[in-house]
Amino acid sequence: MTHIRKALAVFAAALSVTTLCTGVATAGEDSAKAVLRYTEHGIPHIVAKDYAGLGYGYGYASATDNVCELAKIYVTVSAQRSRYFGPDGEGYPSLSEAKNNLHSDLFFQQINDSGVVDGLVAQPAPQGPRPEVRQIVSGYVKGFNAYLARTGRSGITDPACRGADWVRPISEQDFYRHYYSIAVTGGLGFVTEGLFAAPPSGAPSPAPGTPAQLSASLRDGLGKGGLGSNGIAVGADGTAAGRGSVLLGNPHYPWHDGRRFWQSQLTIPGRVDVAGASLLGMPFVMIGHTADAAWTHTVSTPVTFGLFEVPLAPGDPTTYVVDGKPEKMTSREVTVQVRQADGSLKPARQTFWSTRYGPVLNDVGGFPVPWTAKSAYALRDANATNMRGLNTWFELDQARSTADVVRALKSTQGVPWVNTIATDRAGNALYADIQVVPHVTDSQAAACSTPAGQQTLAADGLAILDGSRSSCQWGSDPDALEPGIFGPSRLPQQQRRDYELNANDSAWLSNARAPLTGFPRIVSDQDSERSPRTREALLAAEASKFTTDSMKKLLFADHSLFADLAAADLAKLCASFPGGQAPSSSGPVPVGPACDALASWDHRYTLDSRGSLLFQRFAARLGNVDRFTVPFDPKAPLTTPNTLNAGDAGVQKAFGDALVELRAAGLPPDARLRDGQAVTRNGERIPIHGAQGFLGVLNVMTPVWDPARGNAEVAHGSSFVQVVGFSGRGCPDSSTLLTYSQSANPASPYFSDQTKLYSRGEWVKGRFCEADILRSPALRIVVLR
């Protein structure tokens, strides 16, 4: 083995080894395209001599682990789900909110027919991909196709697509369509069902919803109630050593389908060396670190689309009026092929309507915005012309400092809907929400908002503007790369030496000692209640001096701030019920050991915590109940609101209903978390620690409740987790976990190995530097030629 390691060290410097080939040989090519060096848990360290080779290695390795998941993505963005799976099956929620395959296909077909993706790709940088990005993408496509050519459909080991005719070689167009779908996830992808709007036929239109209902739809649909992330950047003054930095990256993302992360290290000697993870099919590191800088992303609060209400011409619902002049809507009929019960194909057609602002719609995340004889609503997605994010992550992958991170964000302006939190070896901590945001100033909103828009902007940052006036179109900034978005100078950023963090609230309290204020409402609110999870992170940052080990312990402490605020009072309420009977929706229910379990609970969601399941189900049932007696105070944002409103009938009933729910699932009130929260992989039950974000738990796990068994699966939660420390001149001190593991293939050894690690509270040692990679006891080499 020693001579192999020496040869690999030479290869890392010169990329000339050919004697260790265990991969794919391609006739006529004498040198390796890439070398994959696998370490523990199937993590590939991909080395190539150029960007095309780097993409090739990524494409081949990612297909090896997840060919079926990737094939699902490509059949979706090519609008062929109905052709292969029929029209009625569930759409692909990773990429749109389409309710079924047919609507998914029609949605993506109208994007494809519009030519928008091809047009953006054809542009030079900065609007289109820079040359190096094009080389990476070209290599990625060839690498994916090389894997498929080697295995063949019948050789795929994953039963999800073994032998399936919908698994096929891909093109660069497939790749760019996939990226575009990611960019518009928070806009066009969120309102997919609403785009199936038709001119009024004379039948009564559905009643419009209230602004409060729209706010609820936005919070649920855009993920603010579940999907999200934590990012904590600790600078030198916040570390125990007083130098260097520590970063926690902890995105809370789906455990299934196309929004899974996949981990790798990408190296071109002397040019790029970066480790971390990316969404499936993206041959860059999107969250990770270089030798001197580390970064993560968190889902941000700005709503990246806006609505325009347009008046219609009398008697013509497809003509609208701007500045007193009529304009015809444009229409596009799209056609997709649909598999019938007998296996034959028949066409299905749909007409989509559009205005100067964007497509006409009649629904926003389940909230009706009717197209009537008098008015219609059009949507503008600020990311609809954004192909720049690929350039952003290319540049982030070469960052050596937080200054480089800011430079990458400002020069590319491609981040679609996330904050960036970063650290560097010099001891800096950065928060930046330099992303695509609709250019709607407060003064413009005051002059142009509709009555509903006045409420939705204040509550959730959604602008609904008067489309009858061209002066109400989105504005622009001199430093913006395209009209209609804010330039970087107008967006929040802050660098400090103690800490910066975000847990999916606005920019206001990225540091409790240095609030970020004065931004347009659409960019960031201020003086507003912070989530329990944000408060948990801020309180920890204010009270601690961090090491990498203490940061890992903070995350896996699974501590619940909401439990600190309410559990003791809930235990007292439990003990106060007459006759030991709590009220519930189905009548009185005995409290049994519930009171003692809550009173002795440590307020954590570790596997052996008793009382945690009961409190979780109680909190999940509170809904809009007025739960606290002490309201939010903007002068005390870390400690308010507080004190459980134990006298409220809704609070009492939620407790009783939680008891009933546990009993129906066969779980006693004092059950351990491990008894009622687990996933099953290849027949093995794996207990899962953590809990929902609304409980103020940093290590978010959003489980799927089975009434007969308890929490039986994870919908989304902690996914790719990294803790990265810099100190002195040595290698980055990194630990990672991919909670659902590298592969979605149940036949892979990397299907659930890291899930078991996560269950035990263990981490994967980061192997970034050459010596660490070569010391891996699991080292396995694949040379791709």
Regions found by a protein language model. Name each.
Residues V133-G143, D257, G389, D404-A408, ...:
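Stable alpha-helical elements in mature extracytoplasmic
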Residues F305, S375, V415-A540, A619-N624:
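Hydrophobic alpha-helical segments
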Residues F175, S201-P206, Y431, H439-A446, ...:
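A terminal-accessory region detector
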Residues W508-V591, D675-R785:
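Terminal end segments
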Residues D30-V246, P251-D257, P269-R271, G276-S278, ...:
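Substrate-recognition/specificity elements adjacent to catalytic centers across diverse enzyme folds
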Residues M1-A27:
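Secretory targeting and sorting signals
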Residues D65-P126, S528-D608:
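Long, charged, mostly alpha-helical binding arms that flank functional sites
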Residues I268-L280, G288-A293, H297-L462, L491:
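Glycine- and hydrophobic-rich flexible loops that cap the catalytic core of alpha/beta enzyme folds
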